Amino acid sequence: MSKLYGSIEAGGTKFVCAVGDENFQILEKVQFPTTTPYETIEKTVAFFKKFEADLASVAIGSFGPIDIDQNSDTYGYITSTPKPNWANVDFVGLISKDFKIPFYFTTDVNSSAYGETIARSNVKSLVYYTIGTGIGAGTIQNGEFIGGMGHTEAGHVYMAPHPNDVHHGFVGTCPFHKGCLEGLAAGPSLEARTGIRGELIEQNSEVWDIQAYYIAQAAIQATVLYRPQVIVFGGGVMAQEHMLNRVREKFTSLLNDYLPVPDVKDYIVTPAVAENGSATLGNLALAKKIAAR
């Protein structure tokens, strides 16, 4: 049998594990809730043990913060996460000790960003944001992740507040920073403003324009900092069909023709990989890449 590659998308609420071939075709995929580290890792190892004879490598895209510095004593750890029981867990070590193959470790949004570059074969510079329960971003420049001492935390940049939030005294929901992108635009901020879960809020509610205002600011930051070919927005908040055009309109207004960018319909987009599959595709490609070293 030809070589197989593994993908672990380690989310705060669920794990998605998959095995694929050299063409990134998925042969088997499972998902299960993220419970305790012991229980979740045990299920992960059991899944990949079935393919051990042909498994060449595995890539992990994880919730964080995580330590991706291979020279660090805590490389492979989930570090200061607020998720109960998962802080300071040697995630990679606990999984890899049962195998004799290389493992690649990065953030879940980095995996998604990489998957989107694979799906968009002519794109080498891209920023991928997930806008859901939390917010994060992965940035690729010339086919490589950016970052020095560690991964970026784009969800925790401070935002210019929307006038309605100022008027109503809404300061954000992030327990660390309040008025950062995550605190002002992630899913919990919708419910905090309205008392209604996001999926139940009417499309004509002004709260969507507030969300779009903050998400558009993120696109402005990505544009002026990285000058990417494309900015991709995924996650549950952006799954609302009306949101993409709202963000494009706010972005165009805020940028105010300061820099030349592609047509906004080609520049600010949703994922090219269906069914939230960007991270799995990215992980399979990253696993194949490290296996070839």
Curated annotation (Swiss-Prot):
Signal peptide: none annotated. Zn(2+) binds at residues 156, 174, 177, 180. It is an enzyme of class 2 (transferase). One of its GO terms (molecular function) is metal ion binding. Keywords: ATP-binding, Carbohydrate metabolism, Kinase, Magnesium, Metal-binding, Nucleotide-binding, Transferase, Zinc. Its cofactor is Mg(2+). Coiled coil: none annotated. Inhibition by zinc ions. It catalyses: D-fructose + ATP = D-fructose 6-phosphate + ADP + H(+). Its EC number is 2.7.1.4. It comes from the Bacteria. ATP binds at residues 133, 188, 236-240. InterPro entries: ATPase_NBD, Carb_Metab_Reg_Kinase/Isom, ROK, ScrK. This is Fructokinase. It comes from Streptococcus mutans serotype c (strain ATCC 700610 / UA159). The lineage of its organism: Bacteria, Bacillati, Bacillota, Bacilli, Lactobacillales. The gene is scrK.
